[in-house]
Amino acid sequence: MNLSQLHVLVVGGATGGAATALLLARAGARVTLLEKVAQPRAVGAGIGLAENGLAVLESIGLGPAIAAHGRAVDSPAIVDGRSRLMLAPPRPTPRVRMIRRSDLQGLLLDALAAEPRVERQFGAEVIGAERDGRVTARVDGRTVEHRADLVVGADGVHSRIRTAGDFGARVRPPGIAYLRALVDVEAAQGVEAWTGAGIFGSFAVDGGTYFFASAGTRACRHAIAARDLEALRAVWARAYPPSIPLLGAVRRFDDLIFNRVIRVDCQRWVDGRLALLGDAAHAMSPNLGQGANSALVDAAVLLDELRRAADLASGLDAYQRRRRPAVQRVARAAGSMGALAEITNPVARWLRDRLLLPVAARFGGDAAAVVMQELPATLLAIGRA
């Protein structure tokens, strides 16, 4: 398919949407990017870029910048609350780079600004869409109508494109929540700890440490409801002593980011000229670190299948047939991993640690291949073609 004849409207300017806009524009498409945030700003905490996501970003020329801003995760093991090894990563260890989410977004925004075939419209909130490619947005109090050959909904868990189309979506919270923060101390353990209070992970980023912690125990919930930072520190000091310098470096309760996990599963990713990508199509538990990485893979595969196809409809059908089963496998695995990690009952934890984790260790290499979804070399080649 000749992409130079294609006008694509990408809704959502975060990681998946920005990468989609760049990939399609560099392949010849004319792209309009709508982002509801009027002024892009530093948001979020940290993000782990796995080998599949890194390959996509490297294919659009961001490899050197990510290497400069990110920090390699050498051996992302799982330990217990006393820092004893529970599960080592598979060998060879897949590449992972941890980066501040704001740094990654800044790199993508700069790349978009330098791409002449991308028109960026910030402060554009989508309020409606039709399967024939018509999209209605609100900009500065005005209603603006758009029409495109293809509309890509990369607008996240609460996607307006998904609600406008017929995707057979199921949206549900699995009952898991996390706290995240960036602190300017270098006290990262470089591991994920499965403790009596849930998960605590900490990894080095440029100029500090990114950490995340479960927020599901009764003591954690009470501390969060009361906005009591000292009580939260005490919960984690008992469960995992290496958390002490990290939570101690949090100056205000509002410096913590609180996220409830929401799962999204769609029976279809395509409805006419509307197509979903990233969390809009398949938001998952974060326990395998594949949320944003899967969105990047979506972007590359969408480009690949459109280029291969004779027409738009067949390209979109091939995209969803190639991506949906692979993402579903990863989402199920992430949900299972999250459920295992959040076990707080001592007897159930003992059984998990003695019976389930040794079995998981035996199949680590096979599991890593499933998580990657596509060969990194394939993804790299798609963007460079």
Q: Whereabouts are the PLM-identified features?
A:
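Glycine-rich "substrate-gating" loop/helix at the edge of Rossmann-like oxidoreductase active sites
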Residues: 40, 92-98, 289-292
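Short, surface-exposed charged micro-motifs
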Residues: 128, 201, 266
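Active-site substrate-recognition segment that forms the wall
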Residues: 190-221, 229, 233-240
